[in-house]
Amino acid sequence: VLDTKDLQVFKVTVNGQDAKFVFGEKHRFKGTPLEITLPFELRRGQEAIVEIAFESSPKSSALQWLTPEQTSGKKHPFLFSQCQATHCRAIFPCQDTPAVKLTYYAEISVPKELVALMSANRDGEMPDPEDSCRKIYHFSQNVPIPCYLIALVVGALESRKIGPRTLVWAEKELVDKSAYEFAEAEAMLKTAEDLAGPYVWGRYDLLVLPPSFPYGGMENPCLTFVTPTLLAGDRSLSNVIAHEISHSWTGNLVTNKTWEHFWLNEGHTVYLERRIGGRLFGEQFRHFQALGGWRELQNTINTLGDKNPVTNLIPSLNEVDPDATYSSVPYEKGFALLFYLEQLLGGPDVFIGFLKAYIQQFAYKSIVTEDWKQFLYSYFKDKVDVLDKVDWNSWFHAPGMPPVKPTYDMTLANACVALSQRWIKAQECDLDSFSSADLKDMSSHQLIEFLALLLLEAPLPVSHVKRMQQVYDFNAINNSEIRFRWLRLCIKSKWEEAIPLALKMATDQGRMKFTRPLFRDLYSFDKSRDLAVKTFLEHRASMHPVTSMLVGKDLKQDQ
């Protein structure tokens, strides 16, 4: 039995013999099982080669087909895939579960002016013998991976070398900017190897996608996919690269066996990402990023509700589409647990020893939380009394914020807290006391935190946000993380002049982290609700299928 979704199957053979096949019942989001009957009895140890002739649908939930107008170059179409969590089945029949790992090789035929890339080693190219206008690219991935990590992109791509094992790929218009933005990749890789062990994947290339890519990054092996919203111009959003690099160990080598245990992938990856940041930019910076993550978690839980079972670290996903529950919870609640354990068990040096041993123990396997916990107990066997004091049940199975808040170094956060408090406490008559000098010693990271703190409070009076624009000119800032929080702040304060800017950001790019909250806020504001729905319906056809589905739910257009 194989998973499929919106696929047509024409013929199946097993070891060259025709095999009978039938489709089972179609499921709401899981697709349709393909049941193949072997034409002969299999003996133990006998190999069977199953060949399937099939075709995917133009509406495949794993693929976005962009018209030339939707690309930077405006000349050629573009295709990219996004298989996580359960969309690989919408490209080809497979065992679409992270419990199963496989190696793969592929040949991709494309028009010769375009380039094909996959989450694999590039094994060269040749003219297509069947069509002189096309060429064939060869790929092989020799490390076993879950099929959610199979990825394909086709477009007018160019590359720049930014390290001994790293090319950055993008359309011509963005490739030099991307090469500058991600120049720290090799330093991050070296730091990650030092923390987590050898990098087993060979190459580490980066691909910058068109703006509709729905995530910040996707850790496809050998070829990380990233959103162009990371191109801030000052490398300030490079923590996403550290995050995707970290997945080369946590997620891609040690993998969650089911999506309920997604925190094993993401919590450990955020932990490693921040350890890399700590090595490169100092321990205070790591604590500052960790505190920002705690705010992000507070924000998510405010949105979802603190009794909502999807805020459990290990949610129940029976008959639940993993895409529909995607949030910062597995990332930030998972990280908070690891950061708390680090502080409980003897500090960063002690805890990284555990993480390295954990990766060695479970590399190339898929595991559940109980495997992780048993290994934690065996590694820290002399500290079992400390571990027994942890409220495991609340951490794993209770909704809302974690039962314990870790300790954070506040050095870099204090300026953000002080400035946000000044704005919160300010009366109309105090607004003249603010000036552009307030921000002169603050980094982009601190501006993000300042705005995040304001977003956790009751909305500011509209006079305050108008004054903020006057003195800080946030509208002129293109850093996507700053702009996103600033526009949310404006809409929450019901500043009508911000409506077109928020709609523009929600539709100019399709990273769900930005697009969904902006649309939700615009929908909550009576003055922009109808326009938000109208704008969504106008742009829907050009949106990524997953983004379109989830924004449709947010705006009550789909059930």
Language-model features, listed with the residues they occupy:
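Hydrophobic alpha-helical and helix-loop surface patches within well-folded domains
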Residues: 9, 14-17, 30-34, 139, ...
